[in-house]
C-alpha cells in the first residue's frame, strides 16, 4: 500500500510557477554574456532593470479575456518601470494569432512610444544556432521604443 501511494504521489504534477520560470530564463540566458553577441548578454540591459525592480511580470490566467492585456498596458507606469512582461500559457494562442495580436498592440500603442515584442514557443527566433525563445510560455514584452 505504501509503495502504491509513493507511485501515485510521484505521478502528480507539480504546479508550475510561470513567473519564476520566466525570471529563471532571464537570469540564466537573457542576462548571461554569450560569444554569439561579442560576449555581451542577449539583452545587455536586462540584469540592471531586473535588479533595480524596473521589470514587472504579469501572468494572464486562462479565465481572463484578452482585453485584460490592454488594461494591463494602460495601467502600467512606464515612468517608474521599464518593462512589462505579460506571460500566457503557450496553448492560449496559435503562433499566427500571437503575431497578429502583437501587431495590433503595436498599432494601438506606437503613438504612446511603446513597443510590444512577442515570444511564442513555436515561433523560433535564432541568431545562427542560438535559440532566443523562452520556450515554454507565450510572452508579450512591452517597453518604450525610445528608452
Functional labels for PLM-detected ranges:
Residues 2, 11-147:
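Expand to "…catalyze enediolate/carbanion chemistry for C-C bond making/breaking, isomerization
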Amino acid at each position: 500500500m505504501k509503495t502504491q501511494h509513493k507511485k501515485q504521489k510521484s505521478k502528480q504534477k507539480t504546479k508550475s510557477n510561470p513567473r519564476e520560470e520566466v525570471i529563471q530564463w532571464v537570469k540564466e540566458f537573457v542576462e548571461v554574456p554569450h560569444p554569439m553577441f561579442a560576449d555581451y548578454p542577449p539583452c545587455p540591459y536586462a540584469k540592471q532593470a531586473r535588479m533595480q525592480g524596473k521589470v514587472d511580470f504579469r501572468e494572464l490566467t486562462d479565465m481572463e479575456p484578452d482585453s485584460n492585456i490592454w488594461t494591463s498596458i494602460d495601467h502600467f507606469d512606464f515612468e517608474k518601470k521599464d518593462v512589462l512582461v505579460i506571460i500566457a500559457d503557450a496553448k492560449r494562442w496559435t503562433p499566427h494569432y500571437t503575431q497578429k495580436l502583437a501587431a495590433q498592440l503595436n498599432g494601438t500603442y506606437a503613438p504612446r512610444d511603446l513597443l510590444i515584442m512577442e515570444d511564442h514557443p513555436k515561433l523560433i527566433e535564432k541568431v545562427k544556432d542560438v535559440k532566443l525563445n523562452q520556450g515554454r510560455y507565450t510572452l508579450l514584452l512591452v517597453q518604450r521604443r525610445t528608452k
